[in-house]
A protein has these predicted regions:
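Sequence-structural signature of the catalytic-core scaffold of metal-dependent phosphohydrolases
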Residues: 2-66, 74-113, 121-355
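Terminal helices and disordered tails flanking the catalytic cores of nucleotide-processing hydrolases
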Residues: 9, 301, 311-471
Length: 471
């Protein structure tokens, strides 16, 4: 087979090499461009074939305008990285994992594509507004991602088509490269309906299959140890400056094995696995659920909640990027405009009341869980507290952060993974270390709820909230 190379530079700044294959052509086109990515986390790596074609789609390029950590840059000044670079990194890690697991060529392409596309369903500010999409539309970003991959959801808004001439859809590109869109969508969703890991509850020894169908590829994309988590821990740690997320990912990947229909870890990789799971818990406490990060997210979400009628419906909202939703909210009324300005100039709400789980009765927990799942009841209670404190509606906010964890990171409770011993038998991670049980029980956020208000009203709002909620 002869190869011809044509070097050039892409408009997005990636260096590119086009490769022409003479001989049997298995691709949609005889020309296959190779992009060399210079990444802050993984260094230099290449993207080619179907993944290179996907990089030119609106679905992928939209992610360049959505911050990975939402408003966390107001707490961690370096956290301006985007979903786009994260997706590139996840695809690279998936390639490394696929190589270690011994997957064949088509399997590598399939998991590489699933990794690259795993976040295309995200809307503005990533997880910050996801609960609104879930409440109003019954969907999450993974459902939107599935729709994009299967051709059931278009990220372009009305009138934008003319700016993207000769566009090919995601499923069309996949099919042209011999990849099944349904398989890709299934890998991203996870092995069960909600990405849960039901098959991990079984246990056996040796090489008997753990599950009826091989879940190796599915868990590479969405499982207790997957390419998404490895990249976001490393990337978010780097850009926030919080070192808890630094993990020995190369050692961990080297010790992965497809064993009995699932991903297992060789015993020599146990310290690296322990390090990753501990890092995940610490990063959620120190970064993702940092108290001030939560304040900024609550301020933005309340601005959206109280602008219904002025902003797009939940499905159209997902088509926007960060800057667009900011502009929409600025024009959506006095309250939303004030929240946006407060975020712009970092004049944030203040936490005036919080509680740890051990300080709450069963009745208290029931009430807070109800408030977290019923936004109307929560808003009515917030407005009653505000009224008694002499504030306008919206200037008191109640936040139950652990409920948000169910939408943003359903894998947090998945800490049990099979370890392959030198005798060839598999044993649970929990049989090797007490860390498994400790991590499963560990609370991400020490406070299970917060009450926030504008500066100067903390004492009054705290007392009124205490009286209403706990007496």
């Amino acid at each position: 087979m002869q190869l011809k190379y044509k070097k050039g530079y892409l408009r997005n700044g990636f260096s590119s090499t086009a490769v022409s294959f003479k001989g049997k052509d298995t691709l949609a086109s005889s020309w296959c461009a190779v992009k060399t990515i210079n990444d802050a986390i993984h260094g230099q790596f290449r993207i080619d074939g179907v993944r290179e074609h996907l990089l030119s789609t609106p679905e992928m390029n939209k992610l360049s305008h959505i911050k990975q950590l939402g408003l966390a840059h107001l707490v961690f000044p370096g956290a301006h990285h985007t979903r786009f670079e994260h997706s590139l990194g996840v695809s690279h890690v998936a390639e490394m994992m696929a190589e270690s697991l011994g997957l064949d060529g088509l399997e590598k392409d399939t998991v590489g594509v699933a990794a690259l596309l795993h976040d295309v369903g995200h809307g503005p500010y990533s997880h910050t507004l996801e609960h609104i999409l879930h409440e109003r539309g019954g969907l999450d970003h993974m459902s939107i991602t599935e729709g994009i991959i299967l051709g059931d959801y278009d990220v372009l808004r009305e009138g934008e088509e003319s700016s993207v001439p000769e566009r090919k859809s995601v499923p069309e590109i996949l099919e042209n490269h011999g990849i099944d869109p349904k398989e890709v969508a299934g890998l991203i969703r996870g092995p069960d309906a909600k990405g849960s890991e039901r098959n991990l509850l079984s246990w056996t020894e040796g090489r008997t299959n753990f599950v009826e169908n091989d879940k190796t590829k599915a868990h590479l994309i969405h499982g207790p140890v997957d390419c998404d988590q490895i990249d976001y821990l490393l990337r978010d740690s780097h850009f926030t400056g919080v070192k808890h997320g630094i993990i020995d990912h190369r050692r961990l990947i080297m010790c992965l094995e497809s064993h009995g229909g699932d991903i297992s870890v060789e015993e020599g990789g146990l310290p690296a696995l322990e390090g990753m799971l501990v890092a995940r818990g610490l990063m959620y406490s120190a970064v993702y659920f940092h108290r001030v990060t939560r304040v900024t997210e609550v301020m933005l979400s309340r601005a959206v909640e109280r602008s219904e009628g002025y902003i797009p419906d939940s499905f159209d909202l997902q088509r926007r990027v960060d800057a667009e939703i900011w502009q929409v909210l600025h024009e959506a009324g006095d309250f939303s405009r004030d929240m946006i300005r407060r975020l712009k100039y970092r004049q944030l709400l203040k936490v005036c009341l919080s509680r740890r789980k051990q300080d709450l009765s069963e009745e208290d927990i029931r009430l807070l869980t109800e408030l977290a799942s019923d936004s109307k009841k929560r808003m009515d209670l917030e407005d009653e507290i505000a009224r008694r404190a002499g504030l306008e509606p919206g200037y008191v906010a109640i936040d139950v952060p652990n409920i948000k964890l169910l939408l943003s990171e359903p894998r947090m409770s998945q800490v049990d993974i099979r370890i392959i011993g030198d005798d060839g038998k598999t044993r649970w991670f929990r049989e090797h270390t007490p860390l498994a049980e400790a991590l499963r029980k560990r609370q991400v956020s020490q406070a299970v709820f917060y009450v926030m208000t504008i500066p100067g009203f903390e004492g009054k709002v705290s007392q009124i909230s205490e009286d209403i909620l706990f007496t």
